[in-house]
Amino acid sequence: MNKEYKILDNGFLKLIDFMGDDRRIVKAARISYREESVKRKDAELIDYLIRNGHTSPLEQVVFTFHVKAPIFVARQWMRHRTARINEVSGCYSLAREEFYVPLEEDLKCQTSSNSSEKEFKSLEKLSDKIKHHQKHSYELYQDMINANIPKELSRIVLPLSLYTEWYWQIDLNNLFHFIKLRLALDSPKEIKENSPKEMREYAKALISIVREIVPIAFNSFENHFLRGKRFSHEEIIAIINALDLNKLSMDAEKLNLLKDKLGID
């Protein structure tokens, strides 16, 4: 805890506090049965819960993070409405002159066929224009502040690349969902390519933190959801017809789980 993960040029992610771990998930699950009829070992129980979508025990584990990111990242982040957020207020505090400037290779990566390649002779020139725009915007912001214009109105001239900070509290189940959506590992190629690189960097840092606190739960989540795939009924039928499942190198229990998932008696 208190380790600060440096992200982008001026951003960071830091775990402030957490409540619960793998043991809390197990205890929350077993209380439903008064610990009488659940014979599974702890790791097996957690895997069962995650695999079958029994998520309420995961909600017993809660994290609080301190995040610093550009406003355009923050607004995407806050689309996840299952968390509690306290953000730096532009009404009560002065904005700092801290802006995100993408690396030139990232500008090139995100450049489409009909973008401004013809207008700008080089990515270096484009990067310089971004910095100039940011500097000019902040100077205008300061002019408005010095003219005694209220902070909440003066900030309208600041770009989305301005850094903001917030405290973010979220339970493990919804954190897993956040990571899955933002990494887009199981998404079609087109969605992966359009997934914001900046958001993925924060999601990777979240993984580094969560993996240390709930290693058993994270391994199950990674296996079933982060790197797992969903199949349509049509695809399942095609798989069944193409494979001799009994020849798969899986132990009997996992093979039976696979057959059950595919609807094979």
Swiss-Prot record:
Name of the protein in its database record: Flavin-dependent thymidylate synthase
Residue ranges constituting the ThyX domain according to the UniProt record: 11-224
Job of this protein: Catalyzes the reductive methylation of 2'-deoxyuridine-5'-monophosphate (dUMP) to 2'-deoxythymidine-5'-monophosphate (dTMP) while utilizing 5,10-methylenetetrahydrofolate (mTHF) as the methyl donor, and NADPH and FADH(2) as the reductant.
UniProt cross-references to PROSITE patterns, sorted A to Z: THYX
Chain ranges for the short sequence motif ThyX motif as given in the UniProt record: 79-89
Cofactor: FAD
Active site: R182
Organism, as annotated: Borreliella burgdorferi (strain ATCC 35210 / DSM 4680 / CIP 102532 / B31)
Top-level division of the source organism's lineage: Bacteria
BP terms from Gene Ontology: dTMP biosynthetic process; dTTP biosynthetic process; methylation
Pathway terms, separated by semicolons: Pyrimidine metabolism; dTTP biosynthesis
GO MF annotations, alphabetized: flavin adenine dinucleotide binding; NADPH binding; thymidylate synthase (FAD) activity; thymidylate synthase activity
Subunit structure: Homotetramer.
Enzyme Commission number(s) of this protein: 2.1.1.148
Catalyzed reactions: dUMP + (6R)-5,10-methylene-5,6,7,8-tetrahydrofolate + NADPH + H(+) = dTMP + (6S)-5,6,7,8-tetrahydrofolate + NADP(+)
Cofactor binding: number and manner: Binds 4 FAD per tetramer. Each FAD binding site is formed by three monomers.
Keywords: FAD, Flavoprotein, Methyltransferase, NADP, Nucleotide biosynthesis, Plasmid, Transferase
Binding site for FAD: S56, R79, H80, R81, E87, D171, L172, N173, H177
Residues reported in the UniProt entry to bind dUMP: Q76, W77, M78, R79, R155, R182
Similarity comment: Belongs to the thymidylate synthase ThyX family.
